[in-house]
């Protein structure tokens, strides 16, 4: 798996090789970034943005955001195997200083740890997990979003 674009373009990232997790496909990532870049309706750009990567897994979306100029990415993931790979990737790419990792369930991190405001919220929950709906409500309740923001599911 490689980084698609930006300062880290072409660099490899490690990923988990099991049936319970799946990395975000490059084609999906590219489509998301194209929409963000070219849409007249979305007033958020990745460059200089603060990103919240929820259910982040190995962090491929957040790492791609850093490569494309995001100021900071906050990762939330409770799978310890995925977090181990995520940390390895951030260290290997020398971008650990532009990230923050919360090793817990998304709802716990949102309730107890997250207070800064974000431009981009990226949700990539497990297939059968519908808790993201409650977590969107929690984001609204806590008002941890910038005036111009986007939620991607």
PLM segments and residue spans:
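Class I S-adenosyl-L-methionine-dependent methyltransferase catalytic core
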Residues: 1-153
């Amino acid at each position: 798996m490689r980084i698609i674009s930006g300062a880290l373009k072409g660099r490899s990232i490690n990923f988990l090789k099991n049936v319970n997790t799946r990395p975000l496909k490059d084609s999906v990532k590219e489509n998301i970034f194209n929409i963000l870049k070219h849409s007249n309706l979305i007033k958020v750009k990745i460059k200089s943005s603060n990103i919240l990567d929820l259910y982040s897994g190995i962090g491929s979306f957040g790492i791609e955001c850093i490569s494309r100029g995001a100021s900071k990415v906050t990762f939330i993931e409770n799978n310890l195997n995925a977090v181990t790979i995520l940390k390895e990737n951030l260290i290997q790419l020398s971008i650990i200083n532009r990230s923050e990792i919360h090793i817990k369930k998304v709802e716990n991190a949102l309730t107890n740890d997250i207070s800064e405001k974000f431009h981009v919220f990226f949700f990539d929950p497990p297939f059968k997990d519908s808790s993201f709906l409650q977590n969107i409500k929690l984001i609204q309740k806590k008002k941890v979003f910038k005036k111009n923001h986007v939620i991607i599911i």
